[in-house]
Amino acid sequence: MTLSAHVSIAHPAWMDITGPDGAVTHGADQDWFPDLWQQRAGCGPTAAAVILSYLARTRPELAPLYPEGAMDRASFTGLMCRVWEHVTPVSHGLNRPEQMAEGMASFAAARGLTLTPGLFVCPSARTKRPPYEQVEA
């Protein structure tokens, strides 16, 4: 299957999170983690939590990834902390995409689900990259 020139998220508002003051953020913030190290190194686990919650909302069979489904900051921070246990940065963060994919698969497995995250291999040299139109999903 070839990707079209237009790729988008079907329901971006489903990633909105309401803060304690009623303000809405589009996605999560690693600064919500309770621990300073998590705040500094938590970009990967934060992104993983957003992805996993979106999958839980958009695919009923993946609802166990975030069964609460609550999109308030306190509840979502709880999800971020649970995801951290599987998508855990090392001293240099998540410096390989495989670390994030493996951690997300581990999080799903702990909930009785099989999740097979795909990785898009992109050569570092621009001249070796395929044209966008030839990239397959």
Q: Language-model segments: what does each one mean?
A:
Residues 125-137:
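Active-site-adjacent substructure of cysteine-protease-like catalytic cores
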Residues 115-126:
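Acidic carboxylate-rich catalytic motifs and surrounding loops in phosphoryl-/glycosyl-chemistry enzymes
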Residues 103-110, 115-117:
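Mid-length scaffold segments of soluble, non-membrane domains
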Residues 1-106:
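Active-site-adjacent structural segments surrounding the nucleophilic cysteine of cysteine proteases
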